[in-house]
């Protein structure tokens, strides 16, 4: 099971909220990728580079959340 379809839905929601006049083509130009690549991102296609997801996250101002993907919280039991 993959989380990318949900990620794609989140990207689509954020695009429509922050750039309500942008269709997929207009937003893909903002990100610097082709419409076809962006369409794959919204579908959760595994072939899309993580770099493109980060570019979209940066444009949508959620890159800080993106960079925390693998951040481990410190435990009281850690040295």
Residues covered by each model-derived region:
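A short, Lys/Arg-rich alpha-helix, primarily the initiator
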Residues: 1-20, 69
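Short alpha-helical DNA-recognition segment
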Residues: 19-39
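Helix-turn-helix DNA-binding elements, focusing on the entry/boundary residues of the two helices
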Residues: 22-24, 50-53
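Short, charged recognition helix plus adjacent turn
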Residues: 67-79
């Amino acid at each position: 099971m993959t989380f990318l379809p949900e990620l794609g839905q989140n990207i689509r929601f954020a695009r429509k909220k922050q750039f309500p006049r942008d269709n997929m083509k207009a937003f893909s130009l903002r990100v610097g990728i082709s419409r076809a690549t962006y369409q794959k991102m919204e579908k959760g296609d595994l072939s899309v580079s993580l770099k493109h997801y980060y570019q979209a996250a940066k444009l949508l101002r959620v890159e800080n959340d993106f960079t925390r993907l693998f951040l481990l919280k410190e435990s009281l039991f850690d040295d």
